[in-house]
Design a protein with these regions (language model features):
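Active-site nucleophile and cofactor-binding loops and adjacent substrate-binding regions
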Residues: 156-165
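N-terminal ligand-binding/catalytic initiation module
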Residues: 1-153
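Short internal alpha-helix immediately C-terminal to a glycine-rich phosphate-binding loop
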Residues: 164-183
Length: 183
């Protein structure tokens, strides 16, 4: 069985690569009233008074949306958002496994630049950051630019910044191996 067949088997068996789990054990009425109603009203009031309190009272502080329209999926091309969902789930688990960050895949059904920007703007309050993934060039650059102008959270364009980091690391290592010093 090759890697593709094994991967297909894994995906079919697990039916996805991540799940949402509760951090609160709701075992009785008191626990329910603290996690949900009526107790949840107080964190809501605090956030309404001071929006930065969302970083204290919610998972916003550690949650990143992995957003894609599926228009430039590595090795597959323009396969659309839904077909790209396994890739976005994979990226989400990389965030969790290697950085301890809760990545949430968000695939879009359309590929219009303004629609992408609007969709991300609308969901942004939930997240502490946005990771743009597999959006075709040159659209990806203008989507990133517009989102950085409009949002108050970090926007990371994975295909651009991730590649730049890898190239910079390779050049730094080559420089070191060649016995060169910075200066």
């Amino acid at each position: 069985m090759d890697v593709y067949e094994k991967s297909l088997e894994l995906h079919a068996k697990l039916r996805g690569k991540y799940e949402v789990r509760s951090l609160v054990e709701v075992k009785d009425r008191e626990a329910l009233s603290l996690a949900y109603t009526p107790g949840v009203a107080q964190p809501c009031r605090e956030i309404a008074k001071d929006p930065s309190a969302a970083y204290i009272y919610t998972r916003k502080w550690n949650t990143v949306a992995v957003v894609s329209d599926g228009s430039a999926v590595l090795g597959l091309g323009n396969i659309g958002g839904l077909a790209g969902l396994p890739v976005m789930e994979g990226k989400a688990i990389l965030f969790r496994e290697f950085a301890g960050i809760d990545g949430v895949p968000v695939v879009l059904s359309g590929q219009d630049e303004d629609d992408i920007v609007k969709a991300v703007e609308m969901i942004a309050p939930t997240y502490g950051g946005i990771n743009l993934e597999d959006i075709c060039a040159p659209k990806c650059f203008s989507v990133e630019k517009k989102l950085k102008e409009k949002l108050d959270i970090p926007v990371f364009h994975d295909d651009q910044h991730g590649s730049a980091i890898v190239v910079a690391a390779a050049l730094m290592n080559a420089h070191k191996l060649a016995g060169k010093t910075r200066g």
